[in-house]
């Protein structure tokens, strides 16, 4: 397992590259109760030249760590109904991820009501106080959410949840306007969400982002096949 990188070192490693999100949830074709599938996707991503991996769950992350030294952005998806945030939504999930010695922990930093009752700035401060050497990424959906997270001391702001909150911009593709605005504000942006093509990734890279995460367009074969099939129907 490699040493945990500094923010500067990680930004050097991520610059101009693609972070591949290797995830599958129950009910999806590539999900397996016994595991073993996500590390194969991560291995393929590494062989293609990916600069990092985004992964969900302690099991998947451990399996991926066993086959690659690429930096990992780790999350734990767990529902806390009736509240909507489910990506590393409480300190309990942060604790589990921190124990894995991964490069970055990503967490929901939207303004939606949280299970723990905290506002997002307070949650970020608590995590930073408990794990001062851990790099953190805020999954947000709007510029204001990104600004709040940045001002609270988050290391990276990800556009992961744009279009997935009812009040954010609803785009079929990536929220380029949000990515550009955050970059212009001097925030270290990890662009993520609905990036479907190499052309979109290139356009986003030219905005000066710190990193780019691509998931479904690479690691969800059902979604990829559906895109081809729908194109022939139109």
UniProtKB/Swiss-Prot annotation:
Entry EC no(s): 5.1.3.9
Recorded metabolic or biological pathway in which this protein acts: Amino-sugar metabolism; N-acetylneuraminate degradation; D-fructose 6-phosphate from N-acetylneuraminate: step 3/5
Signal peptide: none
Catalytic activity: an N-acyl-D-glucosamine 6-phosphate = an N-acyl-D-mannosamine 6-phosphate
Keyword Ribonucleoprotein among UniProt keywords: no
GO aspect biological process, one term: N-acetylmannosamine catabolic process
Enzymatic class: isomerase
Superkingdom in the source lineage: Bacteria
Keyword terms: Carbohydrate metabolism, Isomerase
GO CC terms, sorted: cytosol
InterPro entries: Aldolase_TIM, NanE, RibuloseP-bd_barrel
Functional description taken from the UniProt entry: Converts N-acetylmannosamine-6-phosphate (ManNAc-6-P) to N-acetylglucosamine-6-phosphate (GlcNAc-6-P).
PANTHER family, sorted: N-ACETYLMANNOSAMINE-6-PHOSPHATE 2-EPIMERASE-RELATED
Entry similarity comment: Belongs to the NanE family.
Official protein name in the record: Putative N-acetylmannosamine-6-phosphate 2-epimerase
Organism annotation: Streptococcus pyogenes serotype M3 (strain ATCC BAA-595 / MGAS315)
Classification lineage: Bacteria, Bacillati, Bacillota, Bacilli, Lactobacillales
């Amino acid at each position: 397992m490699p040493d945990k990188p500094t923010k500067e070192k990680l930004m050097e490693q991520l610059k101009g590259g693609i972070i591949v999100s290797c995830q599958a949830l129950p009910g999806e074709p590539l999900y397996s109760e016994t595991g073993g599938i996500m590390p194969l996707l991560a291995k393929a991503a590494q062989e293609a030249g990916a600069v990092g991996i985004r992964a969900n769950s302690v099991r998947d992350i451990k399996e991926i760590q066993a086959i690659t030294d690429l930096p990992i952005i780790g999350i734990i998806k767990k529902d806390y109904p009736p509240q909507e945030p489910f990506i590393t939504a409480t300190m309990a999930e942060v604790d589990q991820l921190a124990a894995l010695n991964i490069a970055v922990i990503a967490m929901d930093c939207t303004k939606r009501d949280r299970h723990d009752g905290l506002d997002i700035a307070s949650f970020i401060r608590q995590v930073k106080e408990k794990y001062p050497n851990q790099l953190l990424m805020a999954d947000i959906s709007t510029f204001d959410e990104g600004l709040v997270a940045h001002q609270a001391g988050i290391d990276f702001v990800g556009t992961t949840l744009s279009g997935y909150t009812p009040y954010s911009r609803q785009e079929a593709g990536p929220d380029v306007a949000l990515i550009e605005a955050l970059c212009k504000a001097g925030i270290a942006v990890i662009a993520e969400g609905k990036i479907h093509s190499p052309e979109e990734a290139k356009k986003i890279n030219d905005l000066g982002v710190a990193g780019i995460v691509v998931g479904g367009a690479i690691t969800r074969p059902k979604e990829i096949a559906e895109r081809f099939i729908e194109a022939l129907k139109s």
